[in-house]
Amino acid sequence: MSSLPRLYYVTTGLDEATAFATWSAVLAPLFEPRGAGPGKKTPTGSASGVIIGDIIIAKVTFAAQDFVRDAGRIAVTPDHLLLHLYMTGGFNGEITRQQTTIGPGKVAMIDLAYPVNTRAFASSTISLIVPRMLLDGVPLDRMKPRLDPFRNDLLAAHI
């Protein structure tokens, strides 16, 4: 039995330019990271995970930053569904066509077919990235960016 492919990207300890370049490259299929707040500190983060077929599961930690997904990025990258469980931290902003606030213990349902514009706090998350083709028949157009408390707790426990 062969082992599953793994992802491991750490920016801790790298010089600022290399850390930003690495973090930007890791996020490129999903978002553009931008400095947030008055100081606009260079955005950095780390991700480690596993690829299971077409699905990616990863633990992701990052400093406070803005995440942007615009029409240009949408046109040239996959429009997967990103389920993002925030263990710590959270964000405010627009995902899945709605203004949303997500905090610790909550799952963000991010439809990458639409623009994203969020301001994130320093966070630790578990991410599940599912290709749209695996969700055939699921009415994603009715999906909300937040789950009701029961479904959120059930999905968070499962993740």
Question: How would you describe each model-predicted region?
Answer:
Residues 1-46, 55, 92-159:
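Alpha-helical bundle regulatory/interaction domains
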Residues 44-48, 69-71:
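Short secondary-structure capping/turn segments at boundaries of alpha-helices and beta-strands
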Residues 49, 73-75, 80-85, 100, ...:
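His/acidic/aromatic-lined binding-pocket segments of jelly-roll/cupin-type domains
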Residues 53-55, 62-66, 73-93, 132:
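Glycine- and acidic-residue-biased ligand/ion/polar-headgroup-sensing regions
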Residues 60-61, 111:
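Short linear motifs in exposed loops
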